[in-house]
Structures are given as structure tokens and as C-alpha cells.
């Protein structure tokens, strides 16, 4: 029962294995880094001892100090390689763990999408959209029916018929005023006076048959000159 609720112990251990490996690798790299610093200090100390013994003329002790320095240097090189290997392994595990977590997240997302789409397909979506369109159209028809006036006969009156009836009433009103005692009879409209061109009293000069008729040329020239003068006056010339 407990394994059903909380999962089996092996599954939990497998899940914690990458984190545990990363933690142990980091701790071991820190330990080796401290060892590197210690060996570097020992190498510096032995080199100073060799210089001291050499200054005192004790070559054997100076040589022994240099040998110890070489031993420390050899150990330091080995530890450097170990640190490099551990760091590469650490980076690989971290990258693999990151990929694993990414895949888990993607898998959960795919499962969620699958669960969402279980009750959906193209046919059902089309049916639902058709139902929505039908309801929208029905709503528009209902709105149009509600906004329609109750007494439609008022809106069906012919406007031309109203205008004719109005004209008849106006004529009747004019006739009634004329028939009243003492009403002034409307005077007829004065005739429009039409001005005709004057006929010259003297005879028109006869033109020779060989010469072109110049009737109206002088008048046209006068009009052109008058138009030219008006234009000059407008331009201030």
C-alpha cells in the first residue's frame, strides 16, 4: 500500500541518483582543489629550503629538497588530471540530467494536450461551430422581430398621396378666401417688356460686289477694345 501511494523505493532512488552523483562529484572536486593548494604550498616551501641550503653550501640538503619538490609536483599533475576528468563527468551528468528534465516536461505537456484533445475532433468542432452560427442567426432574427413596429399600417402611407391632398387643401383655402365678401381679386401679373433692337433710319450703305461684307466688324473691334481696356484696368496698367 505504501509503495502504491509513494512509489517504490527503487524508482525513488533512480530519480535521486543524478542529483546524488552531481553532489558527490562537486564535493570530490572541492577536496582535490584543496589538495592542489596544499601541494603547491609544499612545492614552494621545498624550493625555498633548497635555496637556503644552497646558500649555506650544503648541496646534499638542497638536492634532497628539490627531490621532494619533484615528488609534490608529480602528485599535483596527477590531481590536476583527476580534477579535469571529474569536471568533464560532472558537466556530462548535469547536461544529461537537464535533458532528462526537459524530456519529462515535454512528455507532461504532450500528455496534457492529449488529455485535452480526447473529447475533441474535427467533426465535433464543425458541429459546434454550426450550432453557434445557427444560434447567432436566430438571435439576429429575434432582435429584428422585436425591433419591428407593432402598427405597420402607419408606415405604409403613400407620401405622394399626402402631397396631393395637401395641394388640394391649399387650393380650397385660396378659393375660400376669394369667395369671401370684400376679398381683393388677385391682379394679373404684369407683362414682361421685351426690348427689341432699334432699326436704323438711314439706308444701309451698299457694298460693291467685289468687296467682302464687313457688317458688324467695327462693332466687334469696339467690343474687343473695350474688353482690352477693362482687362488693363483690372491689372492696373
Curated annotation (Swiss-Prot):
The keyword Lyase does not apply. Pfam families: Snf7 (PF03357). Its main location: cytoplasm. GO terms for cellular component: cytoplasmic side of plasma membrane; cytosol; ESCRT III complex; multivesicular body. It is found in: Cytoplasm; Endosome membrane. Keywords: Coiled coil, Cytoplasm, Endosome, Membrane. Residues 226-237 have a biased composition (Basic and acidic residues). Residues 67-141 form a coiled coil. It is a peripheral membrane protein. Residues 198-209 have a biased composition (Polar residues). One of its GO terms (biological process) is vesicle budding from membrane. The keyword Cytoplasm applies. Residues 187-237 are annotated as: Disordered. GO terms for molecular function: identical protein binding. InterPro entries: Snf7_fam. Required for the sorting and concentration of proteins resulting in the entry of these proteins into the invaginating vesicles of the multivesicular body (MVB). Also required for the proteolytic cleavage of the transcription factor RIM101 in response to alkaline ambient pH. Belongs to the SNF7 family. A component of the endosomal sorting required for transport complex III (ESCRT-III). This is Vacuolar-sorting protein SNF7. The gene is SNF7.
